[in-house]
């Protein structure tokens, strides 16, 4: 079972058993999937490179989190974890919609 992954040229996760190769890839490549600001809230979706599924069938390798300086309920909130790049984009967009609706409803 692999815990470390890198992305191939098509942004598909592939297992990486060489820790040096993995570390170099993580340092040399842009891991940001999407990043948006809504007011002071940052919505960030990134490739983690490490399986966060806790033993799930498919590795959870991408994560959307929010960050806020104003102490809002969105500060350091994990909005979702995903298995693939396209799922991460969809999850990011849903997080943006959710936060936009929340802020617009205040």
Residue ranges and their predicted role:
Residues 9, 69, 86:
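Short, ordered coil/turn segments that flank beta-strands lining enzyme active or ligand-binding pockets
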Residues 1, 48-78, 94, 101:
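Short aromatic-glycine-(Arg/Gly/Cys) micro-motifs in beta-strand/loop hairpins
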Residues 11-16, 76-83:
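Short, exposed beta-strand "edge-strand" segments with a Pro/Gly-rich flavor and a Y/T-containing core
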Residues 83-102:
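A short, charged, amphipathic alpha-helix used as a generic interaction element across diverse proteins
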Residues 1-62:
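Short N-terminal "domain-start" leader segments
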